[in-house]
Amino acid sequence: LQGGEKVDHSTAGAQVAARYGQIPLAFAIAGHHSGLPDGGGRSDTAQDATMFGRLKKSVEPYTQWTNEIKLPSIPPQPEMMKENRFTQAFYTRMLYSCLVDADYLDTENFMSSPKPRGQGQTMDELLKRLNQYTAKWSHPQGTLNQRRSSILSACTTAGQTGRRGLYSLTVPTGGGKTVASLAFALSLAVKNHMDRVIYVIPYTSIIDQTADVFSEILGAENVLEHHSGVDYSAKEDDEPAAYRKALAAENWDAPVVVTTSVQFFESLYGNHASQCRKLHNIANSVVIFDEAQNLPVPYLRPCVAAIAQLVQHYRAAAVLCTATQPALQPLFDELAPGLQMTELCPHPKEQYQAFRRTTLKMRGELEQSQLGAELAAQEQVLCIVNRRKTAQELYNNLPKEGSYCLTTLLYPAHRKQLLQEIRERLKDGLPCRVISTSLIEAGVDVD
């Protein structure tokens, strides 16, 4: 401490845990500063940084601890450890998360005065705020509003009567999916004494609008955004609300977390302490995967395997929420036999007919110049293309007044500004021509 002589307490602690037969705990102790080590092999030497190497390493004698500390009885490992290697690895990560977060918090409390952590409202209080917000929809006017109200009511009832498990919410565009999923999540959390709601979104292009909706309903102080577009510095001289959110972002100690698929799954499969601190706080949470059809196909198996672990072993509930539900049940059947998905939306096929607002017409091949001329002739139009270069070329040939180009090359703040301008022009009935790549297809609201 304070510049004194360093000792390899990580390796020493791991060796003690290994002697007690606690290999997952040994991994966690060995990596609580440098990150979870690779297991390695029995041929590894003491010079290797693997787990096998660390267990062979000679460290300074430390037997004196036995005269000063008595280890508590170590409980047997959970039954899940008999399942398979993946389950064992996942359990090790959760154990590691508990250790590194506790280590950070203990050090923080020792080195400084207590910090403002865990100050959000309870699930009960948030559910009351949601009910107050949705009370204005209790007497819906018009067929579509009645259907939205029916979907919201069905999700609320399912949460009030449901248990932890795997769910799907298949709601067509315009059906009120965001608020309905929140109603289910909070109702389920209250009924089953769960800790938080985590909303996982594939793209940063829609994360702002979701966080804004939740903040309006629940209060900004209860909603944590955590993704690459948000910078948290955790400096004590920051504005108090920003400082509290910076602290909460370290371990997701917040009632509602809005994050990206990248942040969520890379944390589950990462090995650094800063990534893994939050993992134990995913346990006993309701996790909503918005736009679930956009789970990356090359990584679909590890994503589904992680979701199954959270539901089966860590008291979580998962909701796959989308307007175009992917066929994931067969993959769950393969990776987690017996884990069945329950649909929350009443009569999904019927809802699609009611909310249908588009007509498909096959135009065949169009020259880009012809397409550009047709777009320029429209007062309000949206054109989605599959290449950024094409989007820019089409945009360059449109009248500059009221024309917009949306691609992933835009900074998030600039994209947010343009979307707000688009919404205002549509609201005011002004000319508005939007050329976009597929980023707008993932649920971006423009009206």
Whereabouts are the PLM-identified features?
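Inter-Walker segment of RecA-like/P-loop motor cores
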Residues: 219-269
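Conserved interdomain hinge at the start of the Helicase C-terminal
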Residues: 302, 308-309, 357-389, 393
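Interdomain hinge/linker at the junction between the two RecA-like core domains of SF2 helicases
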Residues: 323-377
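Walker A/P-loop
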Residues: 162-185
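Conserved Walker A/P-loop ATP-binding site and its immediately adjacent core
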Residues: 194-218, 230, 327
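Accessory nucleic-acid engagement/destabilization modules that flank
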Residues: 1-132
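Conserved strand-helix element at the start of the C-terminal RecA-like helicase core
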Residues: 196-207, 374-399, 403
